[in-house]
Regions:
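NUDIX/MutT-family hydrolases
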Residues: 76, 88-121
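Short, charged, intrinsically disordered terminal tails
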Residues: 116, 125, 129-133
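Short aromatic/basic micro-patch
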Residues: 21, 71, 102
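The catalytic Nudix box helix
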Residues: 22-55
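Short loop segments at secondary-structure junctions
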Residues: 1-2, 13-14, 80-85, 105-107
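Active-site segment of metal-dependent pyrophosphate-handling enzymes
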Residues: 46-85
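N-terminal strand-loop-strand
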Residues: 1-22
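Conserved short hydrophobic patches within well-ordered secondary structure
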Residues: 8-12, 49, 108
């Protein structure tokens, strides 16, 4: 794609149209966080990817409806595109994802909506600098 790195981003259902996020989700029983990353990327973007390496964790407190506070740890991984067409989502995924698209990695700090995800995109960019496309 023109000699640039891209990342697969999603526009979550029920959020404002300006919200762009990285694919993520809950770890299923018997699954590792790395396996979750590959599965969620496929479900939420329509892409098959290979695990490259872990970028890091984002820790935060989420407040649910009703005021319950939940501590969350989200693990992010660098994945390498294998195949698929972005936006061809798994059946039923419209409940979670309204749209998926490629976004330029060098624009992540302006495009991603969440600070922790912007940090992970910057880590990915630093890791990929000088690496062959």
């Amino acid at each position: 794609m023109g000699g640039r790195w891209f990342f697969a981003a999603t526009r979550p259902t029920g959020r404002p149209k300006a919200v762009w996020a990285l694919p993520k989700g809950l770890v299923d029983p018997g699954e590792t966080p790395a396996e979750t990353a590959v599965r969620e990327a496929a479900e939420e973007t329509g892409l098959t990817a290979l695990l490259d390496e872990k970028l890091g964790d984002v820790r935060y407190v989420h407040t649910r409806r009703g005021g319950e506070r939940v501590f969350k740890i989200v693990s992010f991984y660098l994945l390498r595109y294998r195949r698929g067409r972005i936006g061809e989502l798994s059946p039923g995924m419209e409940i979670e994802v309204e749209e998926a698209r490629w976004l330029p990695l060098d624009e992540a700090s302006q495009l991603l909506s969440y600070a922790g995800e912007r940090d992970m995109a910057e880590r990915a960019r630093a890791h990929l600098d000088g690496r062959a496309l």
